[in-house]
Every structure is written in C-alpha cells, then in structure tokens.
Amino acid sequence: MKNQFLMIAFILVGSVFYTAVSAQSLSVSDIENSVKNDGKYAILVPNARYFQAAVMTGKELKTNNPKMDFEIVLISAVAKDLATDESLKSFIEISEKMGVRIVVCESAMNHFGVKKSDYHPSIKTTPDGFAYMFGLQENGYKTISL
C-alpha cells in the first residue's frame, strides 16, 4: 500500500513538472509566429501613447500577414487626441495604408466634445467602445485591453 501511494505521488509530481517544462519549451519567436495569417485581432486603447504602439503593432503584423484583420478601438482621452494632436496624423495614415481599422467610441467623443467630422475620413465610430469589443469577441476576434 505504501509503495502504491509513493508511486501515485511520484507520477502526480512528475506530471506537474513535465507540464510546466513543456509549456515553456516554446521560444519567443515560436510564440510570436503562432499569430495566424488570417487571424482576427483587436486592441482597446485609452491614450495616445498606446494608440501609437497599437498602430505599429498592427503595421508589423499586417506586413507579415496581409489577410489578417486588425482593429484598434479607441476610448477615453485618445478620442480627443485623435482629433486635435497633429503628431497622430501619420499614425492614422499608416493605419489606413496597412488596412488597420480604427474605431472611436462615440461616448468618449461626446464627453470630449469631438465630432466625427473632426476626424480623418478613414476613422469609423461606434456608439459604445466596450460593446463593440464584446461584438468583436463574439465574432472570433482575439482582443487585448490596455
């Protein structure tokens, strides 16, 4: 009986360590390369700095995977920044060129007094950025909120 207990304990402990080791056996590049060529990805962004980073991520991913869907959903203060900060114009143009969709929350626009006409023509809007993200998830998008 004691031997059976020790054997079961050994198997359980061994399987835990094996699982942990095998989960970390992938290299960083293996993990990055697991992004699907035809995948659907979205990032929820609250500020200009994260918007810039999201655009550059979208550019990199779309360069390697042109069929990929990539969206950036903007909430909070970046809704105002996108309309007023000239330094963001080049990021909007990169997004348009690469086929990265930018969607701005109309609730944030209303809060900051921004109109759709204040934006670049390629910018889309949604009544509620959070509801839009839920919709993307329901449609198979992998999402990140910053």
Language-model-detected regions and their locations in the chain:
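Secreted/extracellular ectodomain signature
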Residues: 23-146
